[in-house]
Amino acid sequence: MARMVNCIKLGREAEGLDLPPVPGELGKRIYESVSKEAWQQWVKYQTMLINENRLNLMDPRARKYLSEQMEKHFFEGGADAIGGFVPPAQ
């Protein structure tokens, strides 16, 4: 049976991650309170952040920026907006 979490991003109970996605305290917090579905949403958003901001992941500043954005995305109400991005109409 899948591990269920009360996902803070989706606001409902959903299947939890199998392992902490990142090391450290942030990874533990995400593991305990973020669902697989919400994590996949973050991965897509992170990809847009990397591409639109032309981040080089070899640069420690870029990795720090993404870590900060990840924390904002899940625990502080949202990450930085992506310049020029218009979400599709639903």
Swiss-Prot record:
Gene Ontology molecular function: iron ion binding
Source organism, top-level taxon: Bacteria
Keyword Iron among UniProt keywords: yes
GO BP terms in the entry: cellular response to oxidative stress
Spans traversing the lipid bilayer: none
One Pfam match: Iron_traffic
Gene3D superfamilies, sorted: Fe(II) trafficking protein YggX
Keywords: Iron
GO cellular component: cytosol
Keyword Iron among record annotations: yes
Family the UniProt entry places it in: Belongs to the Fe(2+)-trafficking protein family.
Summary of the function given for this chain in its UniProt record: Could be a mediator in iron transactions between iron acquisition and iron-requiring processes, such as synthesis and/or repair of Fe-S clusters in biosynthetic enzymes.
Name by which UniProt lists this protein: Probable Fe(2+)-trafficking protein
Species this chain originates from: Azoarcus sp. (strain BH72)
